[in-house]
Amino acid sequence: MNRAEKREFVTWLNKIFQESGSVVVAHYSGLTVSQMSDLRSKIGEAGGAVKVAKNTLAKIALQGTKSESMANLFTGQTLIAYSEDPIVAPKVAVDFAKANDKLVILGGSMGAVSLSVDAVKSLASLPSLNELRAKLVGMISTPATRVAQVIKAPAGQVARVIGAYAQKGEAA
């Protein structure tokens, strides 16, 4: 990478650190190419991305961002998993790390909040934004359905009484 490419990469990475809902930093030493591709595809399907960057460039890109406090995590072979949804990157990274011990979560950030390994794991256990939306819609629609059933019930009872009365009249 020449100087201009490095400068462009640092600018791009700085933008990622500023705009991402969450960033997870992990060691990937020992992962095979197919395992790394699998991680990239899983995070990509969930709406995030994975990037391997030189530690010095990542530290430069962190300067002036809300996530600057996580600069000390960039030692050794590190990768960055990030997503707009604050839950996606931690959830996929932690799930992948459970299945593959070569991926070691170091920490991360969510906006200005620096996250420890335990905080990243806690964040991963939360439902995603889409799951929360689905639960909210379910909670909102359930009372409406019940109200409709309550309103329909008296009319149904009247119809059954009239039907029973009609059958009684036919039998007589």
From Swiss-Prot:
Whether RNA-binding counts among this entry's keywords is yes
Q: Does the keyword rRNA-binding apply?
A: yes
Instruction: List, in alphabetical order, the Gene Ontology terms for molecular function in this entry.
Output: large ribosomal subunit rRNA binding; structural constituent of ribosome
Q: Which SUPFAM superfamilies match?
A: Ribosomal protein L10-like
Q: Where is the signal peptide?
A: none
Q: Tell me which UniProt keywords the record has, alphabetically.
A: Ribonucleoprotein, Ribosomal protein, RNA-binding, rRNA-binding
Q: Pfam families of this UniProt entry?
A: Ribosomal_L10
What name goes with this protein? Large ribosomal subunit protein uL10
Give the gene that encodes this protein. Answer: rplJ
